């Protein structure tokens, strides 16, 4: 299935000069959504845990984990997860941010696939990789719906042994 047909361009969103890749048409089409989740699950079938960042990583990571009957671990911004959390600060284009996971869900030696909607600069994924490695996880795969190749995110997260799979590249 050609998933590019289900991703539309929106000019000047979220601000002037930006060409936004809108995945809403894909989410609104049951067959395209099913194909996406099935494809992601096929790639992730040999890992122990699926991890995804808030918010759109949840849209693809949770159903991927459910199809595989594997746990899904949320990565969120501060103050969104109860209990003991592990934090990692990371740089953005203009400033920085913090990501957190709950401390008791990742076990040392577990293999992980990170699932998200878009790979742009790679900053978020790189921070998640560091956060998970600090917990002793083995990151095997990064599975992305849409990769913006001009932004070189793949290069910024390319580490030994991590397979990066994008279903669509622009």
UniProtKB/Swiss-Prot annotation:
It is an enzyme of class 2 (transferase). It comes from the Bacteria. CDD domains: PRTases_typeI (cd06223). SUPFAM superfamilies: PRTase-like. Pathway: Purine metabolism; AMP biosynthesis via salvage pathway; AMP from adenine: step 1/1. GO terms for biological process: adenine salvage; AMP salvage; purine ribonucleoside salvage. Pfam families: Pribosyltran. Keywords: Cytoplasm, Glycosyltransferase, Purine salvage, Transferase. It catalyses: AMP + diphosphate = 5-phospho-alpha-D-ribose 1-diphosphate + adenine. Its main location: cytoplasm. One of its GO terms (molecular function) is adenine phosphoribosyltransferase activity. InterPro entries: Ade_phspho_trans, PRibTrfase_dom, PRTase-like, UPRTase/APRTase. Its EC number is 2.4.2.7. It is found in: Cytoplasm. One of its GO terms (cellular component) is cytoplasm. Belongs to the purine/pyrimidine phosphoribosyltransferase family. NCBIfam families: apt (TIGR01090), PRK02304.1-3 (NF002634), PRK02304.1-5 (NF002636). Homodimer. Catalyzes a salvage reaction resulting in the formation of AMP, that is energically less costly than de novo synthesis. This is Adenine phosphoribosyltransferase. It comes from Mycoplasmopsis agalactiae (strain NCTC 10123 / CIP 59.7 / PG2) (Mycoplasma agalactiae).
């Amino acid at each position: 299935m050609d998933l590019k047909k289900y991703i539309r361009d929106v000019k000047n969103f979220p601000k002037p000069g930006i060409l936004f890749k809108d995945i809403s048409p894909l989410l609104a089409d049951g067959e395209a959504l099913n194909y996406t989740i099935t494809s992601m699950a096929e790639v992730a079938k040999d890992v122990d845990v699926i991890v995804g960042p808030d918010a759109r990583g949840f849209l693809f990571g949770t159903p991927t984990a459910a199809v595989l009957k594997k746990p899904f671990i949320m990565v969120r911004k501060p103050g969104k997860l109860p209990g003991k959390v592990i934090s990692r600060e990371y740089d953005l284009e203009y400033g920085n941010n913090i990501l957190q996971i709950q401390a008791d869900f990742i076990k040392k030696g577990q293999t992980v696939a990170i699932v998200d909607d878009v790979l742009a600069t790679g900053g978020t994924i790189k921070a998640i990789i560091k956060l998970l490695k600090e917990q002793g996880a083995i990151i095997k795969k990064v599975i992305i719906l849409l990769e913006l190749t001009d932004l070189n995110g793949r290069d910024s997260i390319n580490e030994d042994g991590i397979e990066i799979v994008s279903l669509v590249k622009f």
